[in-house]
């Protein structure tokens, strides 16, 4: 039974959830209704806040198959609950007449997943998701995704499009003809409208949601309570504050919704043409598109309303919305395996692996290319929220909660305050009963103590520091869409950097070329643009093997391609639409050298000149293009020289990959050494290759050939050497981070040795440090996976004869201190393939490699995300800085992701820098640290404020008195609010320091600081309260009491006689009240100064002019009304007149209190800096962070780091813990 009741949906995915079924129970509902009436609606609120309780209180468990309501719980660390109502989709609403037409409609794919099943099997397709007789499908919607009941798996499953389980063959064979109108209508019923609907909630809806926040409900309760106790002014002030807070909150929430709505509305409804089965073209709204529709891409381009795979023609697309890369990308049609080499036909289509053939939703198609008047067609694979843009919008609409120790501790602290309030509550009731106070008064006063202990202004106070930090970040050009992350950035202790465009300049400069002739390298050449090379295959490859296109007459495309094309100085011409329509086999793109290079290229006499005039029109047409793929690390083209019978294939890409696809006899013997020399110097190297194609390959065959048939058996032609200069600010920024004990890691798509060289140049790896390259090989031919360890020579050792000798001595890890993890003497470097193998087969090595991994090269976008996760698993707080191009996932996953791209892709990143420079990283960390320390200061201050006020009220309750309405008002508005909002204004300290701020409130030093201040304040308040009773002039105060000088007293009393009867009711005017009011008012200011920390994370508090001015003004004002009473002020604040001598005594109490408080707070700071490290080293305490614990372990591990030229093998059978053994190869 239990198995039937609890199931998992989205298994293995980020949004994996447990699902439980429930049915509504009438008797439970009746009991809950009664409870709601009895509690005056409070139970209803409680059930509104807790979906789990709501469902369990009103429903009974049921089998998921037949339930009315589902309860969902996330399986991550947050264990969040959601509930959703089951709805029924009736297929009878759509006129499906005969069973025959029904099976036709289903033969193209069943209801949930449009895989290609045989028609017979698909006849039962619908019954998987519904009861066939009634034609009804049960489903629920959660976070904008529909989950349908699937009978095959006996669970709910979300609707998939053509992006899963569909082979490339079937895309052409089964889906390229288009849908019938009936099938389209049927799918429309299931998939719904194709739109990413970001509904902007009405102000009323937002208001209700905001007002029903537990915090505002507590404030409402407080206001009602104070009003019944006749604290009208204070209640009114809190109401005004709450309204201001709600209005500002509503404004910012609605503004974000409107921004998001505008962002997705650009393509929400456009008119599109679709092909139907009978070749007819129908024009429909984009909202009516369903997976399987064949969409015609218009000539003049469009904004894509869905994800679609190209099956005809070529498109130039701007994908900046998704990737942040403003460079136009060329998309070609999906290779058709049925006309290609056999054996590839089973490859499944996947939008990620086939992204060069997929047009993504929200991206802009700038131009289309087509042949022989054919239409450019694409098959819709995903619609609505399933599209790549839809998923991005969903991640913004439903973000994962940020798990940060500070917030967890804040809740714990609030619980402590509630416990303290509970004690006060019981004390007040007992004290009032003993003094025979009326029941009504007891209830009001005992509840009042709760509202005093839990300060209503706490959430506003806590966010003040973050808001100010956000404003300061904006001033230095860093924009933030997730303000809560600013505090988390204060904890960052490791930052990952992308290389190209982040650490180095965006563009590459051509340094030179090194050609190969007869399998030997020629000497490097600087100039490619000369007559000698103009007709060489090498230059032809540079001229044709690229994805450049002309947009409005300007060459655009990949910056690397542009640089290469500009270096040869050729001209690119593209066919116009008219030409394409006229000629049967027009080549869409033609390249030719400039005229001045050609005639001079023939050093012939006049008589021969005429013969050369004809072929002087030397042109190469690009027949077919296989775009660059980061997975394959290469691109290739098929081209033909004008007049030649045979076509040529050209290829360029990563040297290792290109060399492996060339005939071994054409690759120079010293290829590896030459390549290594260039990469060690930090050059980016690209290899070129070429081969003549067979004459039987016609233009038409080439259009359908697979790239594997072209990309083999090539002739190696040589290398292009590109220079990627470091950005000017890079070394200085990295040095600042190292000084601050913040580790830096490079994650790049570039060659490993180039990356290691750049890491050395920028100071990420110091000259004396060792680099260990981990080369992991997957299991093959029955052999287990293994890692080969090589020690990369440092640059200085390259030409040194002792290079081999030095490799034999591994350098042992040296630490100055535990924290000083940056002082490691060795670094690991690996590429993406090795990283994947290690993750899969060597799980126990992953944490060790994370501790010292510095260079990760040739990393694919998803591997970057996996790396961030692996670092977070060893308790690093990880920052990621990239240009947004392919770092979206990593930027989102990191604790603090900062994108250097101003484009819309930055919606994936919590932070975006206006200036594309990594100097924003230390700035962000500094501001994060300042905001974090501000949060601590404010929290400590608010805690003290509530305890001081709580104790003042408890003392006064003991004599059946209380603070007056205007006394509360003065303390809460004039003192607390002013202090809280000005103490948060301290700007960040000028530089990053090695010390790191604490991450949580529950730390020894912090708790000791708060507790010591509480004891001091309680002590001095009690001293004043009890000492005033010992004074010779003291008596229980009554309207005619005269403790002051006669004249002063008469003046004061005469002005008050009218109001006495009213004031006596609450017994507010007495000597104890006046004493406690003055001492506590000073105490608030004393702890504000004590807690306003400056160095090393914030500027000193004397530089915070608003704070200094506010505190001085309040000090002077309180001191003035204490020493020189003003009748009108005393009347408003309900202060009684006390002798001048007692006023001076109070001043002395306050001064001693200030001295003790500030001295103790300073000593706590000193104790933390001096004694804590000593105590830790004496106690041999195990560090909390996994990486620090691991560092301690590795210090005594004789087997680590691995010795050079050794191999680590995975143990074949023990797979679950990924154990491994080390084998030394001699």
UniProtKB/Swiss-Prot annotation:
Cytoplasmic domain ranges by topology: 1-28, 50-205, 254-409, 470-940, 984-999, 1095-1105, 1165-1226
What membrane topology term does the record carry? Multi-pass membrane protein
| Domain of life (superkingdom) | Eukaryota
Q: What does this protein do?
A: ATP-driven pump involved in endocytosis-dependent polyamine transport. Uses ATP as an energy source to transfer polyamine precursor putrescine from the endosomal compartment to the cytosol.
Per the record, ranges on the Lumenal side are 227-232, 431-448, 962, 1021-1073, 1127-1143
Q: Which residues bind ATP?
A: 498-500, 628, 684, 750, 883-887
Q: Name one GO biological process term.
A: intracellular calcium ion homeostasis
Q: Can you tell me which family this protein belongs to?
A: Belongs to the cation transport ATPase (P-type) (TC 3.A.3) family. Type V subfamily.
The membrane-spanning stretches of this chain are 206-226, 233-253, 410-430, 449-469, 941-961, 963-983, 1000-1020, 1074-1094, 1106-1126, 1144-1164
In the UniProt record, what gene is named as encoding this protein? ATP13A3
One of the record's GO molecular function terms: ATP hydrolysis activity
Q: Which UniProt keywords apply?
A: ATP-binding, Endosome, Magnesium, Membrane, Metal-binding, Nucleotide-binding, Phosphoprotein, Translocase, Transmembrane, Transmembrane helix
Q: Which NCBIfam families is this protein grouped with?
A: ATPase_P-type, P-ATPase-V
> Which catalytic reaction applies to this protein?
putrescine(out) + ATP + H2O = putrescine(in) + ADP + phosphate + H(+)
Main enzyme class: translocase
- Please tell me where Mg(2+) binds in this chain: 498, 500, 883
Give the UniProt subcellular location, in the record's own words.
Recycling endosome membrane; Early endosome membrane; Late endosome membrane
- Residue spans that sit within the membrane without traversing it, per the record: 29-49
Record PTM Phosphoserine, positions in chain: 98, 817
- The protein in question is named Polyamine-transporting ATPase 13A3
Highest lineage ranks of the organism?
Answer: Eukaryota, Metazoa, Chordata, Craniata, Vertebrata
Give the active-site positions. 498
One matching Pfam family, short form? P5-ATPase
